[in-house]
């Protein structure tokens, strides 16, 4: 097996797991260097862990702004959001089973939609995002409720397995096999901004439960307004619906040991953990006549 050196642009828990997996199987001689960056959009970005591991095992490490020129024949990018000027082949790992969920935050949006399978796709980078030929994928069936942190724990080993299989193929044959995507099956996933973390109480309670779980840690968490204050919903669950003659989404209908049960467009949702902007719990809620917006 003829080893080659590759450049790695890695972020997130998935990037860390791939880093450890590649090192474990192939040693540090396959690393030209590793580049990482902090991510202010999420609570936990694994930058320190990636840097520390590289330093511990003597893999050249660079912060994004100090990134050297890429001279390796192949480059692997995981959870990377910036352009990479690679001379050779650029391999991107994407958080969905392409061609579905091309674009941004595919795992988050997959969980919101209650997809029965989640996974990862390795593809050749292209000018149009996520339209390159597929090098391989891995998938797993999931059940709900499922928090985003749990989903990441599930898919991270798939990243490691897929990358190691691709490297074995590359080192054994000198090249990588690919196949075109089926364009008719393509869907797209939009980027998220602050407004995308806000709960729409007009949605049904099943969707709201998945939404809260999908945007939780390491993301910034689902938000709603209560008496002109933004609060963050950390956990909750669907409870059986009742017949409401004058249904109004967002209003509290019951209180269960200080935990408000909120009317949704369809169904009811009980808030079990919630904090204010200072990170302090707002529960048990003392006021009954509350409407979340």
Model-identified regions with their sequence ranges:
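A conserved acidic, glycine/proline-rich C-terminal tail/linker
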Residues: 237-260
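One-carbon transfer enzymes
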Residues: 1-219, 223, 254-260, 264-270, ...
């Amino acid at each position: 097996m003829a080893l080659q050196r590759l450049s790695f642009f890695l972020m997130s828990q998935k990037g860390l797991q791939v880093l450890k997996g590649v090192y474990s199987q192939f040693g540090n001689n396959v690393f030209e260097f590793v580049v990482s960056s902090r991510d202010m959009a999420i609570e936990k970005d694994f930058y320190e862990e990636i840097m520390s591991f590289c330093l511990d095992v003597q893999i050249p490490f660079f912060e994004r702004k100090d990134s050297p020129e890429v001279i390796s024949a192949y480059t692997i990018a995981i959870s990377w959001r910036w352009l990479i000027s690679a001379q050779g082949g650029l391999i991107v790992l994407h958080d969905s089973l392409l061609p579905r969920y091309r674009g941004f935050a595919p795992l988050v949006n997959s969980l919101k939609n209650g997809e029965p399978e989640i996974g990862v796709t390795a593809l050749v980078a292209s000018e149009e995002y996520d339209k390159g030929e597929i090098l391989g994928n891995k998938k797993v069936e999931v059940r709900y409720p499922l928090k985003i942190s749990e989903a990441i724990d599930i898919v991270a080993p798939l990243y490691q397995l897929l990358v190691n299989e691709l490297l074995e193929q590359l080192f054994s044959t000198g090249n990588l096999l690919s196949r075109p995507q089926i364009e008719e099956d393509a869907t797209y996933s939009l980027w998220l901004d602050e407004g995308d973390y806000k709960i729409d109480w007009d949605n049904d309670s099943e969707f709201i439960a998945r939404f809260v779980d999908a945007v939780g840690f390491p993301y910034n968490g689902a938000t709603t307004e209560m008496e002109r204050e933004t609060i963050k919903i950390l956990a909750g669950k669907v409870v059986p619906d009742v017949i409401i003659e004058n249904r109004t989404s967002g209003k509290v209908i019951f209180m269960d040991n200080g935990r408000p049960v909120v009317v949704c467009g369809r169904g009811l949702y009980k808030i079990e953990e919630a904090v204010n902007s200072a990170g302090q719990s707002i529960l048990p809620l003392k006021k009954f006549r509350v409407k979340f917006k």
